[in-house]
Amino acid sequence: MIRTALAASTLLLAAVPAFAQSQQDALDARYDRALAAGYKALMLCGAIANAERNGATRTPESVEQWELTGIQAPHDAIIGTLPYDIIRRPSGQIAHVAVRWADDMPPRIAANFGPETGCSVLPIGAPEDTSNPEQPLPVAAGVEPKVLGTGTLSAAPRRKAKAPNALDRVFDSALAGHYGEGTRTTATLVRFQRSGSGLVEQSSYAAGFGEKTPQRTWSVAKSLAATLIGAAVHSGEATVADPIALNYWTAGGATDPRNAITIDHALRMASGRYSDTPGNRTDALYFGGSTIDETAMNWPVLHAPGTVFRYANNDTLLALKGISQWLSFYPPDQFFAKLGMAETVAETDIRGDYVMSSQVWSTASDLADFGQLYLNDGVLPSGERILPEDWTTYVSTPSGPQPDGAFGYGAGFWLMNRSEGVPADTFAAFGNRGQYVVIVPSRDVVIVRRGEDPAGSGFDIAAFTRDVLAALPTN
């Protein structure tokens, strides 16, 4: 009898963990559907609304073909099954996108908050009437509703290359997928100096994409964030040695080691902080509707700041907290306007904090303007300096711990100093799904490649850079 009771107890104890695991699996599957729906809503809203802002057109079918295929598991298998509605205001502008994912919950909502900050995904469970389609959108200064993107680009004059040349052949190879199996190039653009012609720009686009078509920059946004921080440093509002010192850290006084984390540590991906997912996966923030404060700020340190490299979205978001007061007076849209980047939008979480680890939409030409700023050592074509004199050197110089692999890391930028056949001073902004802005100071060249590469594929940016440089005149 005793033996039988013990056996029954053992079976019961074994069953409880199995039941708990089964319940957890069901919760995880439901959460994955909610995240996939948020991803779909935000991509549809961002791609279409930001294109229309620029005077371009993206259809839902185009977004489903490009942005919504080849994404990371498990969302890739879910997204195509989720129905959606695009709700427009009487003006014709997108109000929000609703994606249905569960019979007992409201659809996931991505709401369009206007031309200055674009679309934000709302929290899971937010009611659809949170985004009122009758409420008119604000209009950014100098921007007309519906027919947008008329602002001037960089004031530096540049000519379009016309005759077919060696660079066209490199572009054609990229569009044909020759720089990585399965890669999908949407745009290539090179800006360079030609003797007797000045600044020349040459570009090529996949069908359905063009000069005014924005795409999500993904982690190229990290380099844009580092540039914003440079502008704050130049204005005297911060130094990279400043501790970030969030209020809820300083409340703990000397007992909280996170008070030692500086802007420099965060820009160099060396805060020493832990997170429970790979550093490039912050799905709860990006697609779950959580906020930066909720998801990115409170992780503990596992290593002394400045001693270990760990690529992390959270570190870029932390670095921006170091200039949060400055950003409240000088938001990204004003900074982009100063650079002539009229077709670039930095989006926010629902509290208005900029998700500049990833959530920026921009065109290839605007990103070339961004790269040109570094070739000009932080000076605008008007002659106004907006970055410190040593900022280009700062962001492109390795310091402290470095990543393993083919590329080094500076401060918010990747370094191509390990890439054979590429000038050692080359540095770059890299982003998910094949976003690249390559800056080659010694050749006075900016190279932009946009793509929607599927997960698991890889565009060979070093080979592409070598081929582009070989195709250009050496003056």
How does the language model describe each region?
Residues 22-25, 58, 114-115, 123-139, ...:
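Structured C-terminal helix/loop/strand segments within mature extracytoplasmic catalytic/sensor domains
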Residues 344-345, 392-446:
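Active-site Gly/Thr loop motif
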Residues 250-282, 286-307, 311-317, 362-365:
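Conserved catalytic neighborhood of penicillin-recognizing serine enzymes
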Residues 196, 215-241, 266, 319-323, ...:
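Active-site SXXK
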Residues 93-184, 191-194:
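Non-catalytic propeptide/linker segments at domain boundaries
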Residues 166-209, 437-438, 444-448:
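A short, well-structured edge-of-sheet supersecondary motif
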Residues 45, 226, 315-325, 358-380, ...:
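Active-site-proximal alpha-helical segments within enzyme catalytic domains
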Residues 235-271, 298-301, 325-362:
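Active-site helix/loop module of the DD-peptidase/beta-lactamase fold
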